[in-house]
């Protein structure tokens, strides 16, 4: 595997702030919500957008997406304006330093899911986890389910240690499904001794292709429960 540290850049000033806050205590929780294979109702995407729009953020890590994306399978958009091309939608994958409503710092990994070099990407995130003493990584996304929208949304919780989700009900037995980068990340972090949990919000299948804010609200409520962060969920409820 090629050197994982060569696919991302760290802002030294923001890094110094994170390290100063972590000195002598626990580091920041890392929340991840990358846009990838499955995100029914846009649960993870809307959650990430809410956090970056409602809370104070600083860019800590920027990934080199040219090394990680297959542009021909997921083409960015661009506007043709009469006689010229403008507004190229540049894809990004980044980690932001975010402060919750009480000023508690945490990290947010968001943007596009890598198409290639998953192992290198997972190793890069592990380096970030270890550098900044991250005690817990929490992932969120949505999955389509045969449920009505008139009932409260439920989640499937998963973790690399069963103690992390002891209070949750298991909805499934063993099932083989296509992987995503978040699943690999959870596995690799566990193999390295780092705690990671995730929440897949059950979204009514007929709403899976449309933005469904209630799914992101549910996702963030479970992130709060797992991490103790205060994430301004009420603002999303009112939107």
Residue ranges and their predicted role:
Residues 60-62, 229-239:
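Flexible, glycine/charged-enriched surface loops at secondary-structure junctions
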Residues 104, 112-163, 185:
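Internal, conserved structured core segments that host functional sites
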Residues 34-38, 108-118, 168-176, 206-210:
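Flexible, glycine/proline-enriched loop segments at strand-loop-helix junctions
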Residues 1-111:
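N-terminal short beta-loop-beta anion/metal-coordinating cradle
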Residues 40-44, 48, 114, 118, ...:
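Generic structural signal for well-ordered, non-membrane alpha-helical segments
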Residues 146-226, 230:
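Catalytic cores of processing enzymes, dominated by hydrolases/peptidases
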């Amino acid at each position: 595997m090629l050197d994982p540290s060569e696919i991302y850049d760290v802002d030294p000033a923001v890094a110094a702030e994170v390290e100063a806050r972590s000195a002598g205590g626990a580091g920041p929780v890392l929340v991840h919500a990358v846009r990838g294979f499955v995100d029914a109702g846009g649960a993870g995407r809307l959650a990430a957008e809410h956090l970056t729009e409602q809370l104070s953020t600083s860019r800590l890590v920027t990934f080199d997406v040219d090394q990680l994306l297959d542009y021909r399978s997921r083409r960015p958009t661009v506007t043709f304006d009469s006689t010229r091309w403008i507004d190229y939608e540049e894809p990004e994958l980044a980690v932001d330093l975010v402060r919750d409503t009480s000023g508690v710092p945490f990290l947010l990994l968001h943007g596009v899911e890598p198409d290639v070099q998953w192992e290198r990407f997972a190793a890069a995130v592990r380096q970030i986890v270890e550098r900044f003493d991250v005690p817990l990584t929490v992932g969120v996304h949505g999955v389509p389910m045969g449920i009505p929208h008139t009932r409260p949304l439920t989640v499937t919780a998963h973790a690399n240690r069963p103690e992390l989700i002891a209070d949750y009900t298991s909805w499934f037995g063993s099932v083989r499904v296509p992987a995503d980068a978040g699943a690999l990340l959870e596995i690799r972090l566990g193999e390295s001794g780092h705690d990671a949990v995730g929440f897949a919000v059950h979204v009514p299948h007929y709403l899976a292709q449309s933005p469904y804010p209630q799914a992101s609200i549910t996702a963030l409520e479970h992130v709060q429960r797992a991490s103790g962060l205060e994430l301004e969920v009420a603002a999303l409820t009112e939107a």
